[in-house]
Amino acid sequence: MPIRHCIVHLIEKKPDGTPAVLHARDSELAESQAIENMLADLNESYNAKQGKAWGLFHPESGAHPFSGWLKEYIDGGSDFTAFSRMAVEHLQKLMEESNLSVGGHVLFAHYQQGMTDYLAIALLHHSEGVAVNAELDVTPSRHLDLGQLHLAARINISEWQNNKQSKQYISFIKGKNGKKVSEYFRDFIGCQEGVDGPGETRTLLKAFSDFVESEDLPEESAREKTKTLVDYASSQSKMGEPMGLEELSELIDEERPRAFYDHIRNKDYGLSPEIPADKRTLNQFRRFTGRAEGLSISFEAHLLGDKIEYDESAGTLIIKGLPTQLTDQLKRR
């Protein structure tokens, strides 16, 4: 993962309305193994974070100047240090306007992954710990707590430049308890939500369920294809990459690589060719299966409490909305 440019600034700020104090670095960080390790750990933590949103830049304006500064830097009109300095001064101003915000170390990193350029921005904080020194004494130790990542964003520079129709070249962490804590950071980037990750993932899972039902697949085959979908989505999420519908279709059925993709297009589910995988939604998508004495039951977990009701004390399942194929068979019995 080549790191093209990296710099860290410090903003001191308490959530009590006091002015934010900026300590800006004057030059980029020199290449080192420590920086490579930090960025690798940051990416791993960011990719694993649930509750991210995807979007695109607002049109450049006085309220949203970040994209203009980034374009100027990419086009060679300013260097990385100057770009980061303008950006962090803007962030300082927004922090002062938000009583909920706290300061921290602001990381800007321009790096490549494969053939793609990214810009990562994160507000980092220290944690207190302990270490054992060369004399075997236990001593206090401070370290960047990359596991507790609350405010961060990643911009796919390549997609932003080359795909003018894209609405998901920015990803950012949304606030857990309401939006207010993270609103100023989203405004700093100048980002508007363009893709509903959880909603798109739910629609994909609905399309897959419909596909399995329309294909009348044996239970074992349906279970294997479900596992393929979940494994692929989880893998893409871990890498911070979107799911490609054509690629997923090829994995689901190697003999008919376009079958699932054509099902999605023909039924007009309204899915984009690439969609972000929402981990929380995926975790709800697993199958309950059981077989005994000529009876075989298999259904997806998200149907429990909706189309399927389970009475534990009576040991019964109530199924609503039976498949038409099954009801037709029952009528002809």
UniProtKB/Swiss-Prot annotation:
Cell compartments where the protein resides: Cytoplasm, Nucleoid
Signal peptide: none
Annotated family: Belongs to the YejK family.
Sorted UniProt keywords: Cytoplasm
A Pfam family the protein falls into: NA37
Gene Ontology terms: cellular component: bacterial nucleoid; cytoplasm
Predominant cellular place of this UniProt entry's protein: cytoplasm
Protein name: Nucleoid-associated protein Psyr_1083
MF terms (GO), sorted A to Z: double-stranded DNA binding; single-stranded RNA binding
Lineage of the species this protein comes from: Bacteria, Pseudomonadati, Pseudomonadota, Gammaproteobacteria, Pseudomonadales
